[in-house]
Structures are given as C-alpha cells and as structure tokens.
C-alpha cells in the first residue's frame, strides 16, 4: 500500500507523538528506508511511457516558445541628462572625509569602466535589429531606431562617424579628451561662422611628425586591441585601395571625402554650406561601407565641433541624391503603394545624418555590429513603455568567453541580521542605473549596435525581393522594396515620427559610451558602485542604515522625522554626484521593508505576498501522477527554492526534484509528495535574526556514538550501527537542540556548521532541517570541544567549558568604517601545525 501523507508526516517526526528522538532519528539515515520511501512516493522512477507534460500554470517547459507581444503604442522612455561627476572620489571625500581602501577601489573601477574581451565577433549590419516580431517588422525597426536615437541624444551611445572617429552628445569626460598617457594634447576647435581654421594650431601635429616613434609608443598604449599600424598614426599618403585613394590626406582631419581638390576648402567655406556638403558626401561614402574619412591624420583626441543650428537644411535642395529615401522623389510611382507617394508628402525631409556636439578619436571600429537589439515591455507592470534588450551574449559563449568577476550578494540570513530591526524604511529609485557608469572609449569597438538602414532591412525580410547591391541603386532596384505592407506601416509611422522617418531609414552604427545591460560585466560594476556609495553614506550618518543591491537603495532611521531628513540629505548628496534619483518612485515602507522579494521587519523575514500567491497558484495547477518535463520542474524549483528557507523542511524537501532535473528526466508528483510539499508551503515561518550570545551547549560524535555537554551536564549514547561521520555529527547536533532547547550550539563539523543538509539521506535532511531551524552554530576545534570525551564513551574526564562568544554575521557587508583590506591573491602558506589548533583564542 502506498505511503499516506499522515504516515509520511509521522515518519519525518513532524508530528508530536513520535518516540524518543535518540531512537527515531538515526532510523531516517538508513539507506534501505530512504529507498523504500522513494519507491513508495514514486520519486525515482525516470522511465515513464506516458508523454511528458510541458506546461503547468504559467510555467512552460521544453519545445514551447513564449511569443513576445509587440505593442505598436510603446512609448520610448526619456533619459535625463545623466552625467556622473568625474571627481566623484573628491566629492565623497568632502562629504565623509578620507575614503576606505574598499570604497576607493570600487569607485576607481567605474571611472571609467574598462572592458577587455578575448575575441570579438563582428556581425553584418542586417543583424543589428533582431526580427523578433515577424508581424511588425517595420514598426519594430522604427521604434528600435528611435530608442537608439534617444540613447545617443542622451549621451549614452557614441555614433560611429568613420573607422577612427565617433561623435556623441552630452558633457565630455577627461579620458575622452586626452589620448592615453598624455601623449597628444587635446585641442578644442570651435568652428563658428566663417572663421578660417589655422592649419598649424598647437597640438595638431603636421602629418610628417606623426612618425614611427609615436606610432610605436602608441602601439603600447592600453587602448585594447590595436590596428597594426599604430593606433592614431596617419596612413601612408594616398591611402590603400580604391576607396581610400579618394580620401584626401589633409593634415587637419577634415570630414568629407572629396574626389579631388585641396583638403581645407570645407573649413574655410561658410559653415552651413560646408555641413550640407559634408553630409551629402558622407552619405556617398557610406555606401562604400568602410571609408576612412581623413580623420586618421588628425592628432587630436577629440574635436569639439559645434554644428550651428542652421546647418540642418535639407539635402534635397540640389545636392547629390545618393540617399535611398530621397531617390524616390524623382522616380515614377510604380503602384498606388509606391513609397514615392510618402516621400513627396513634404519638401524638407531634414538631414540624412545628425552629428553629435563632440567628436572623439576611437580605436579602429569596423562598420559592423557585435550584438543585436530588440524591444520588450519595460516590466510586467508597465507595458506602455518599452525597454531595449541588447544581446551581447557572444562574450559569454564559446571557448573565448570572458569569465565575469564574481561579487558577494548577502544571503538570506545575513540580510535578516542586517536589516531586521525596528527602523523606519524607505527605498530610492535610481533611474536608468546602468547608464550612469561611463565606459572607456577603447571598449566602444566591442560593443556596437546599429542597423543596416530600412532598405536593406526590408529587402532582407521580404521573400519576393533579393538583396540588392546598393553600391549603385538603379530605379528598378529602388522599387523592389515597395509593398502595400510597407506603405501602410510608413503612413502610420509618419504620424508618429514625421520627417524623422528619413533620418531613421539610413544605416547607423552606435557604440556604448555607458555600460550596457547585456554584458556580464555590468551587474558587477553596478553592484560595486552602489555598495561603495552606500558605504560612504553609512559612514556619514553612523546612526542610520543605508544598503543597496544593484540599483535598489534602502535607507533606515529610528523615527519617521529622522528618516525624512536623512532622505533629503542623501538625495542631495546623490544628486551632487550626478546620480539621478526619481522622487516620484520613492517608496516609504514604515517598519516592514520590502526588499529583494522579501518583507523584512523586526520579527524577521518572509517572502513578499505576490510570491506566496504564485506558490499557491502553482500547487493548484500541479498535476498528480503525470510526468512533468524537467524544464518545467526547473521553473517550479526556482519558485519554491526562493521560499524554501521559510518552510519546516527547507531545501532538503526539494531534493527529489533537483535530482530529476540534473538527470534531465521527467518527474511525477505522487499525491503524498504533492500534499507534503503544499502543506510545507502553506504555513511559512519567518527567518529570525541571529542574536549574539555565549555558547553553553556542545555536541560531538564519532561514527559509533554521540556526546553532549550541556552546561555542566554530560551525556553520551551509541548508534545501533556505525554511521558516516557527517551523519553522526548532524544527529548529535539535533539531540543537543532537542535536549537543551539552546539556540546556540558548538560543533567541530564544518558540514553541520554550514547548515546545508541537502547531501544527507533525504528523510534525515528533512527532519534535521526542522529540528535545527533557527539554531546558530559556533565552530569549536576538536581539541577543545567539551563533548569530545563523552562521544568517545568517557564521562569521567571533564574539560572546562569554554566561554565561546558568538557574533552573528552580516556577510561581506561591512557596516563599520574599517572595511577589510583587499586579500592578496597568493594566500600565505598554511602550516599543518595550524596556529588555530595550537594557540587557539576565542574569536
């Protein structure tokens, strides 16, 4: 007869009427019993002939793809002018005095952040915007382009202007102005009106002087992977290949690719016409994909071009119509859905390309992308705004993958010890936290996004037209892309974007200037940044608490009035550093803080209500006696694992599920196992904070017997059959807890100390977790353990009781000013006659 739920509870000693613990508990370690129970509960039966279930409630498993929903009404979020102050370390020093080693190190990491991948794969521009929504191709294209344009305008992206130069908006940082190691000095060239531009201005080296000496010095600079000929050295006169031969090698780095004539005609001409000509010519050059536009000769790091406003006159007035969009103007309509009807709607479509306020030299940047982008809902609660997803997963795959740095996240117990108190809480919302952290320009060539332009994108996706060679578009090729769908989409988009349609239909390549979300380095850098800032705030206000996890910052103070004044002071401090706090999204929590999915109050920690609801729903939908695909099990375990520490039996109760997932087998829930789990998750017990105290109770065991020292009392017992040592130590700890009721037990076993009972026999792990819930352990070396003698059967010899103080841990979150120094990477040699055993002093 299969095991009933009541019987199973009795077996696990979850009921009160169980026999004496010293007899019952060792039985649960018996392998035979564990195997019989597993068979009864149908836990280890992988060979099932029934087809697997691939969906349970909202959890989908193998062979199912969730189709993302496209929203044509998505709003692009606005990004404030985010500019983290460069002298952030000095500002923190003014605020709190000298910084600790840890804070200094963390802030240096992000000013600027550097990124050195092992290998970078460059993808064609067609892969820039992912065809994630096949039904809404054009719509998605323009929304994504608009999002990218918004990011560029907000100073979050660089725009690639040529192989070696890029432009950007916003305030420049010092590393964007001087070349590495101060070799070449930064000069600003303000080009206003008709002022002619002096060819020999200081800091601009004439071509001949950029000689091999500087080339070789530059080659050693740490700007990441170098082009072979010295990163900023001018190419040999005349360039190489037919494309570059048309680039006139002028010493002052003019933009513009001219067929002939002298190099500085653009500069001396009036700005408006020069810009006009440049944009026309630049368009012509664009189709030749990789043109180096004379910039390789300029010796400056950044030229700050201030383009006058009147320069954005339309290019359609008499200049070369090399632009796909404007060519429709002069062509005959091919049908009633021809694009020329749209292009003829207005005369002035604006410029073909926009240029940033500042220009910067970059390492060689190919006209390619390294990751694709697509849009999704901003979050499950906000579907009106979109969020840009950037896929730079190439850096995390294959043999050349980058191993991202690890960083400490406080576990549940540390978090509770830290935040469970009678303080009042509020949480701050940092808007676009990732986009605060600046990246070194050398990383730009590795983090490129962009698009190939509307014509290529549409041609790529429409089955009836082949990809056209756009070097010389003939009229026939031009109309290949006309279709009813495109026409209707563009007419609707014209209402939204107006003449920007023209700008967005051009190809563009953008590199990140601030850290993007799709790279494994970003969470690490953000965590370092916010934890350093919180550390500074904690030291400035020692009677308050500030804590952060990624972009979630919480403040706690003794009273509400105190909290409000703290909030004002901290917000002003953050704003002075250039951090954007969104005051509308500040949440005041009262005494129970909602943080990282938990509710934390003075009584301890519990999961938030929405997680409890999800768990209830999960059990309601969970089928019995049907094999469930392991991918679904993985998602179920993800949800249940989060709340496991709040149940009686904890993680060990989920072990059968873990085992089937790692074997990639289907799992069948028997009615008893399902009833057991749902009962476990019905009543959740808070995880309380640990208190410091003196340890008075000690446990020890040998494979054959156990011993306890409770105050001045000694006890011992033997096991019916010898047990593995870790199992014996765990049993001894359970006996100590049940005999003495002490919350603090001394043990010399590291596995018991770690409180992870998942590797023990399943039934024992579940029972021990319940018995030892809320117990803290203190390490005591065997030589000094008072319970050592009783466990070996000797009751006569008394070792004096130790005075072992216990301090609860807050993980690696140091709340005190003296943060630990950085450990050296080479550990000191540990001698076998360890000082711990010889001259051991209580911690």
From Swiss-Prot:
<keyword id="KW-1090">Inhibition of host innate immune response by virus</keyword>
<keyword id="KW-0235">DNA replication</keyword>
<dbReference type="InterPro" id="IPR037531">
    <property type="entry name" value="HBV_DPOL"/>
</dbReference>
<keyword id="KW-0945">Host-virus interaction</keyword>
<keyword id="KW-0479">Metal-binding</keyword>
<keyword id="KW-0239">DNA-directed DNA polymerase</keyword>
<dbReference type="Pfam" id="PF00336">
    <property type="entry name" value="DNA_pol_viral_C"/>
</dbReference>
<keyword id="KW-0540">Nuclease</keyword>
<dbReference type="InterPro" id="IPR052055">
    <property type="entry name" value="Hepadnavirus_pol/RT"/>
</dbReference>
<feature type="region of interest" description="Terminal protein domain (TP)">
    <location>
        <begin position="1"/>
        <end position="177"/>
    </location>
</feature>
<dbReference type="GO" id="GO:0006260">
    <property type="term" value="P:DNA replication"/>
</dbReference>
<dbReference type="Pfam" id="PF00242">
    <property type="entry name" value="DNA_pol_viral_N"/>
</dbReference>
<feature type="region of interest" description="Disordered">
    <location>
        <begin position="220"/>
        <end position="258"/>
    </location>
</feature>
<keyword id="KW-0808">Transferase</keyword>
<dbReference type="GO" id="GO:0003677">
    <property type="term" value="F:DNA binding"/>
</dbReference>
<dbReference type="InterPro" id="IPR000201">
    <property type="entry name" value="DNApol_viral_N"/>
</dbReference>
<dbReference type="GO" id="GO:0003964">
    <property type="term" value="F:RNA-directed DNA polymerase activity"/>
</dbReference>
<feature type="domain" description="Reverse transcriptase">
    <location>
        <begin position="357"/>
        <end position="600"/>
    </location>
</feature>
<keyword id="KW-0378">Hydrolase</keyword>
<dbReference type="GO" id="GO:0003887">
    <property type="term" value="F:DNA-directed DNA polymerase activity"/>
</dbReference>
<feature type="region of interest" description="Polymerase/reverse transcriptase domain (RT)">
    <location>
        <begin position="347"/>
        <end position="690"/>
    </location>
</feature>
<dbReference type="GO" id="GO:0004523">
    <property type="term" value="F:RNA-DNA hybrid ribonuclease activity"/>
</dbReference>
<feature type="region of interest" description="Spacer">
    <location>
        <begin position="178"/>
        <end position="346"/>
    </location>
</feature>
<dbReference type="GO" id="GO:0052170">
    <property type="term" value="P:symbiont-mediated suppression of host innate immune response"/>
</dbReference>
<keyword id="KW-0899">Viral immunoevasion</keyword>
<dbReference type="InterPro" id="IPR001462">
    <property type="entry name" value="DNApol_viral_C"/>
</dbReference>
<feature type="binding site">
    <location>
        <position position="552"/>
    </location>
    <ligand>
        <name>Mg(2+)</name>
    </ligand>
</feature>
<feature type="region of interest" description="Disordered">
    <location>
        <begin position="292"/>
        <end position="319"/>
    </location>
</feature>
<dbReference type="InterPro" id="IPR000477">
    <property type="entry name" value="RT_dom"/>
</dbReference>
<keyword id="KW-0255">Endonuclease</keyword>
<dbReference type="InterPro" id="IPR043502">
    <property type="entry name" value="DNA/RNA_pol_sf"/>
</dbReference>
<dbReference type="InterPro" id="IPR043128">
    <property type="entry name" value="Rev_trsase/Diguanyl_cyclase"/>
</dbReference>
<comment type="similarity">
    <text>Belongs to the hepadnaviridae P protein family.</text>
</comment>
<protein>
    <recommendedName>
        <fullName>Protein P</fullName>
        <ecNumber>2.7.7.7</ecNumber>
        <ecNumber>2.7.7.49</ecNumber>
        <ecNumber>3.1.26.4</ecNumber>
    </recommendedName>
</protein>
<keyword id="KW-0460">Magnesium</keyword>
<feature type="site" description="Priming of reverse-transcription by covalently linking the first nucleotide of the (-)DNA">
    <location>
        <position position="63"/>
    </location>
</feature>
<keyword id="KW-0548">Nucleotidyltransferase</keyword>
<dbReference type="GO" id="GO:0046872">
    <property type="term" value="F:metal ion binding"/>
</dbReference>
<keyword id="KW-0511">Multifunctional enzyme</keyword>
<feature type="binding site">
    <location>
        <position position="551"/>
    </location>
    <ligand>
        <name>Mg(2+)</name>
    </ligand>
</feature>
<feature type="compositionally biased region" description="Low complexity">
    <location>
        <begin position="308"/>
        <end position="319"/>
    </location>
</feature>
<keyword id="KW-0238">DNA-binding</keyword>
